Amino acid sequence: SECLVGSEMCIRDRMEACVDGKLDAIDLQFEDNAAVCVVLASDGYPVAYEKGFEITGLEKFEGKEDYFCFHAGTKFNEAGKIVTNGGRVLGITATGADLKEARKKAYEATEWVNFANKYMRHDIGKAIDEA
């Protein structure tokens, strides 16, 4: 994606302003919401893990405005299927009115995606729920 979650401005425009030394001349605009990202990793990461497991459920992100799936350790296999190809496989991100809502939605979206050795932490943003 060329735009940042929570930003109303294209990341390319920000990068060009940085390169041109004109970051102070642009109006950085952000949405009034929160975002939480939960990484789906390969079990065993970072020490030892298997690759090549087919990833299913990615189509569930289509048409969902507040949900994002960022690919990291993925690739297409010979059959054209998306498979795992690294330790940090996907970044499942959701936005909400506040951090509690964003966290709830991000963890909800992690259940949409499946692959054989899927692993994730369950404590991302946990302090938010305890506050």
Feature-to-residue mapping (PLM):
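Single conserved hydrophobic/aromatic residue that forms the stacking wall/gate
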Residues: 1-6, 10-11
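Peripheral (often C-terminal) accessory segments that flank ATP-dependent C-N-forming ligase machineries
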Residues: 17-131
